[in-house]
């Protein structure tokens, strides 16, 4: 029973943090970023900003770099 109350207290503490920053910090906001955060040539992609020439595929930013 004590564990339940501890869990409830932690959950209430985390939800008491308000705003987009809390959602980003907790990973609840889709993508983690909004387009305004990423800049003009970048897009939100799976919690990070995916910028040209990289491409976002299935929520993962595939970094285009020199061939391995």
Swiss-Prot record:
<feature type="propeptide">
    <location>
        <begin position="30"/>
        <end position="35"/>
    </location>
</feature>
<keyword id="KW-0964">Secreted</keyword>
<comment type="similarity">
    <text>Belongs to the conotoxin G2 superfamily. 1 family.</text>
</comment>
<feature type="disulfide bond">
    <location>
        <begin position="50"/>
        <end position="61"/>
    </location>
</feature>
<keyword id="KW-0379">Hydroxylation</keyword>
<feature type="disulfide bond">
    <location>
        <begin position="42"/>
        <end position="51"/>
    </location>
</feature>
<protein>
    <recommendedName>
        <fullName>Conotoxin phi-MiXXVIIB</fullName>
    </recommendedName>
</protein>
<feature type="disulfide bond">
    <location>
        <begin position="45"/>
        <end position="56"/>
    </location>
</feature>
<feature type="modified residue" description="4-hydroxyproline">
    <location>
        <position position="44"/>
    </location>
</feature>
<comment type="function">
    <text>This peptide promotes cell proliferation (EC(50)=17.85 uM) and inhibits apoptosis (EC(50)=2.2 uM).</text>
</comment>
<keyword id="KW-1015">Disulfide bond</keyword>
<feature type="signal peptide">
    <location>
        <begin position="1"/>
        <end position="29"/>
    </location>
</feature>
<dbReference type="GO" id="GO:0005576">
    <property type="term" value="C:extracellular region"/>
</dbReference>
<keyword id="KW-0732">Signal</keyword>
<feature type="disulfide bond">
    <location>
        <begin position="38"/>
        <end position="49"/>
    </location>
</feature>
